[in-house]
Amino acid sequence: MIHTKTGSGRRILTFPTVEPSESISIVTLLDSLIQLAGDILTFKSKHFSTNKQSFRETLRRIQNLLVVFEEIRIRIRNSRRYFHDSAAASSLKEIHVGFQKLKFLLEDCTRDGARLCMMMNSDQVSDHLRVLTRSISTSLSAFPVASVDLTTEVNELIDLVVRQARKYGVQPETNDKRAVSSINRILALFVNRVVPDPDEINRILDHVGIRKWGDCVKEINFLGEEIDAERLDEKKKKSSDQVELLSSLMGFICYCRCIILGRIERDDHHNHHEDGIKKDHDLIRGLKVEDLLCPISLEIMTDPVVIETGHTYDRSSITKWFGSGNITCPITGKILTSTELVDNVSVRQVIRKHCKTNGIVLAGISRRRKSHDDVVPESLAAKGAGKLIAKFLTSELINGGEEMIYRAVREIRVQTKTSSFNRSCLVKAGAVTPLLKLLSSVDIRIQENAMAGILNLSKHVTGKSKIAGEGLKILVEILNEGAKTETRLYSASALFYLSSVEDYSRLIGENPDAIPGLMNIVKGDDYGDSAKRSALLAVMGLLMQSDNHWRVLAAGAVPILLDLLRSGEISGGLTADCLATLAKLAEYPDGTIGVIRRGGLKLAVKILSSSEDSPVAVKQHCVGLILNLCLNGGRDVVGVLVKNSLVMGSLYTVLSNGEYGGSKKASALIRMIHEFQERKTGSVEPNLQRGRFVHAW
């Protein structure tokens, strides 16, 4: 049997065929043709987005050809002599290639997600179909029917197929032309921000077979993939024109999803989303998030690559590691003979699936390409559609009923997840104020999605100012009293983004419930490591404002973090974050005293001297913590380090790790220890304030 390529990974309207072998037998070739014909006929029950009549007629001819090939196979198998006719073989091989291409074309025109794009390419589709049908009929007419004892009926069937192909040529269909004209007219309206006729849009959607929210999601995903592919195709000089068209179509289908189909369906989009999440959960069941973290940066890898030892790292992290003069594997310490990096495609796909399932947005899943969601639309039509959508959704938030409001906040959450353009449109449309009001909703669905929308809008500059000006109080209330765990975590993340502005960081800190609320997440048993890290990230953001330092200490941060570290049940990423926060607190004398009084120095030394398999970031922040304790604790703290024989060896190990190992801090600690040993003086009063002396150990 001849195996052909599947459609996976194939660009639309490309036909990568496999030529039958020169030595293939006629019977084997006929078997493959019959199987291909059967595969093609399965498309009879599917919806064609374009050239519907032409495809139906073509499938009728394939049905007739299937009868012909089955009859030829029977005749040859029943023949007592070996059958070999070069003309027959050549004819069937050409038909086989034509069938492969036809199958690909059928896949494209019935593909979920590609309906709108294929309809806009209806002229090109009809050209391909015309060429293929003529090629198949020409090859069939060259078949030496005299060499096979066929019945009169079969010979007449062959003549019929050939005559039909010659007489009835494939032409662009009127309905397709009308639909394309309608779309172009609507795109022109979008440019001028004019609301199109919904009835006209519904006629287009009916024509191509898009009737559900989930259908629109598939279309958007496909168009995004095509935009990415066009950008990467450097050979195309006119690629920008195609990107502009695809961007316009994405704007159109987003408009349909939010405004047209949103009115028709009740919760179809929610069910579709939940079903998708369930499938994704099934696919990544048993996955440990730690497996997706770069061993160097302890962050989820955006561009995973494999080095010579077989270990996987994030490209940017391992590149900097090598750039610092290190030619060893960070995990094993093995000296490498090559620093070549190989893409880990499997891990990248798992990371994408994990991020999609958990709503995680990375800066870029691959540094070599931009996500289509994270760029400004590349057409005026798409920009106009985005502004109309934002205006509509904001109006729904203000004037809609409960279900309309729910659909609007859910759509805003999706629209703003990664698109800075959509965030800008919604902020300008005035969506922040009604979203903040909806945080008080008794409907937990509305509250959760409104909070997720606020989180996304907090990444926008103007969004920050509006949220900080109107909603800090309600954000802190949600942080402490949100109906769902996810809602409280969204609030913590929003506070982190707001804390990047100094004035907002001060205002957050002045709220007496903000920092304690974040620390409750860090110490809470109901929260996983990922949630605790999100809360710590917000705390670190607040610590950038010096006025918040004492507030974090007052919230019990030091004992909470030390207890977490002592538990030994947290991930390397959370360990590194705890140490980083303690190091920041220890920059001030009060923080140093708090850490030392609770045995933090001893614990830090223990972590530093632990197994060499500890993540590099853990050791880096551990060194930073010890250094700050020494700077504020004086010679008493340094003296403790001198007494521990393992400290120097651990520091030299960190020093050898280069930039990521905190080499400058390790070098400073080594220098302090050497100076202490060289002086060999008596007891020296520590730098801690009188009356506040604490034992370093």
UniProtKB/Swiss-Prot annotation:
Q: What is its main location?
A: membrane
Q: Which Pfam families does this one have?
A: Arm (PF00514), PUB10_N (PF25368), U-box (PF04564)
What changing residue 305 to I does, per the record, is: Abrogated E3 ligase activity
Question: What are the boundaries of the region U-box N-terminal domain (UND) required for EXO70B1 binding and crucial for the negative regulation of ABA-dependent stomatal movement?
Answer: 23-210
Q: Mind naming one GO cellular-component term on file for this protein?
A: membrane
GO biological process terms, alphabetically, are:
abscisic acid-activated signaling pathway; protein ubiquitination; regulation of abscisic acid-activated signaling pathway; regulation of seed germination; regulation of stomatal movement
**If you read the UniProt record, what top EC class would you report for this enzyme, in one word?**
transferase
Q: Where in the cell is it found?
A: Endomembrane system
One GO MF term on file is:
ubiquitin protein ligase activity
Pathway listed for it is: Protein modification; protein ubiquitination
Query: Which Cys residues form disulphide pairs?
Result: none
UniProt EC number: 2.3.2.27
Domain U-box, chain residue ranges per copy = 287-361
Keywords for the protein's UniProt record, in alphabetical order? Abscisic acid signaling pathway, Membrane, Repeat, Transferase, Ubl conjugation pathway
Catalytic activity entry? S-ubiquitinyl-[E2 ubiquitin-conjugating enzyme]-L-cysteine + [acceptor protein]-L-lysine = [E2 ubiquitin-conjugating enzyme]-L-cysteine + N(6)-ubiquitinyl-[acceptor protein]-L-lysine
Intervals holding ARM repeats = 420-459, 461-500, 502-544, 546-587, 589-631, 657-696
**Subunit structure, as described in the record:** Interacts with EXO70B1 via its U-box N-terminal domain (UND).
Domain text from the record? Answer: The U-box N-terminal domain (UND) confers binding specificity and subsequent ubiquitination.
Quote the function comment for this protein.
Functions as an E3 ubiquitin ligase. Mediates EXO70B1 ubiquitination. Involved in the regulation of abscisic acid (ABA)-mediated stomatal movements.
Q: What protein name is recorded for this chain?
A: U-box domain-containing protein 18
Query: What is this protein's gene name?
Result: PUB18
